[in-house]
Amino acid sequence: HVGFINVDGEKMSKSLGNFFTIRDVMEKFHPEVIRYFIVSSHYRSPVNFSDFALKEAKTALSRFYHSFKAYQQMYGQKIVETLEQGFVERFNAAMRDDFNTAETMAVLFELNKELNRAVKEETAEQATVLYSTLRYLTNILGLVQHDVDEFFFFFFFHEALYLSDKEIDNFIQQRFDAKRAN
């Protein structure tokens, strides 16, 4: 990525005190979420970095993992060499269009939606082709590289480490209120 990095709408700089390293960010966010965040914007456009934006990236990336989990629960890890060419062609066209990753993401989310529909309707052959296609295309961008359960396990425990004092106090109060209600 070669665009400027903005932090909450301001250009990142040491003099403004809004400077951080990638290591700092990786202490709070899964590396694949950071990758998704960067890949989802055009490589020459400025990136507006914020915790909120990274949380949105986590939510978006999680949609792929949820779909993969739903497929795997129905059909296991089965993949086929046959790919849904319409999606592959649209993805490739977006990549040839000055690495238009915003458009590639639109293609991936449309494909993800079709995969979810096929899994829900239990059309095994179609679901397998769509799953195989989505795996292939996300792989090109280096996304959805982890075991589904490991990915979600990371968030369950990692995010608990970064609860604010206020969030911890809220959980304590909720527990206290629940005990008192019983």
Predicted regions and their residues:
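Basic, alpha-helical terminal appendages of large translation-related enzymes
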Residues: 106-182
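Short helix-capping and inter-helix turn/linker motifs at the boundaries of alpha-helical repeat units
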Residues: 12-13, 81-82, 86, 162-167
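Non-catalytic interaction-recognition regions
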Residues: 31-33, 38-39, 96, 100, ...
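Helix-loop elements that line ligand-binding/catalytic pockets
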Residues: 47, 53-125
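Alpha-helical recognition segments enriched in aromatics with Gly/Pro capping
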Residues: 1-72
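Short coil/turn segments at secondary-structure boundaries
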Residues: 2, 37-38, 75-80, 104-107, ...
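Short acidic (Asp/Glu) and glycine-rich catalytic loops that position anionic groups and cofactors
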Residues: 5-6, 15-16, 36-45, 85-89, ...
